[in-house]
Amino acid sequence: MALTVPLIVLAVLLSLMESPASAPVHRGRGGWTLNSAGYLLGPVLHPPSRAEGGGKGKTALGILDLWKAIDGLPYPQSQLASKRSLGETFAKPDSGVTFVGVPDVVPWKRIRPGTTRFQI
């Protein structure tokens, strides 16, 4: 009687273990892939293994459907052509702060102690 309990526990534990055939196959990270410029290209697609059987035509049609769905998505703004001229691209930006009757200077360089930079 004392020997049967450990044998039953051992049998249950062995049945719960994964065999190499039932273990999931990890084929890399998966997910989405980027090109060298950092633009999103699409999902990483792995060809089916020979163990999964035929169905080569079904897989190809599935990949085509996936790419058609992805092509229907809107592109991010960074891929659209910029309408700025070369001069606008390299132009020096404004300070962004203008006061009436006050020359355009860097406001924080003329701050007196005890005042904030937005006081006039």
From Swiss-Prot:
Signal peptide annotation: 1-22
Record's keyword terms, sorted: Cleavage on pair of basic residues, Hormone, Neuropeptide, Secreted, Signal
PROSITE patterns to which the protein is assigned, alphabetical: GALANIN (PS00861)
GO biological process, one term: neuropeptide signaling pathway
GO terms under cellular component: extracellular region
Main location: secreted
Subcellular location: Secreted
GO MF annotations in UniProt: hormone activity
Keyword Nucleus: no
Chain residues in the propeptide: 85-120
Entries under InterPro entries matching the protein: Galanin (IPR008174), GALP (IPR039244)
Purpose of the protein: Hypothalamic neuropeptide which binds to the G-protein-coupled galanin receptors (GALR1, GALR2 and GALR3). Involved in a large number of putative physiological functions in CNS homeostatic processes, including the regulation of gonadotropin-releasing hormone secretion.
Annotated family: Belongs to the galanin family.
PANTHER family registered for this protein in UniProt: GALANIN-LIKE PEPTIDE, GALANIN-RELATED PEPTIDE
Protein's UniProt name: Galanin-like peptide
Organism: Sus scrofa (Pig)
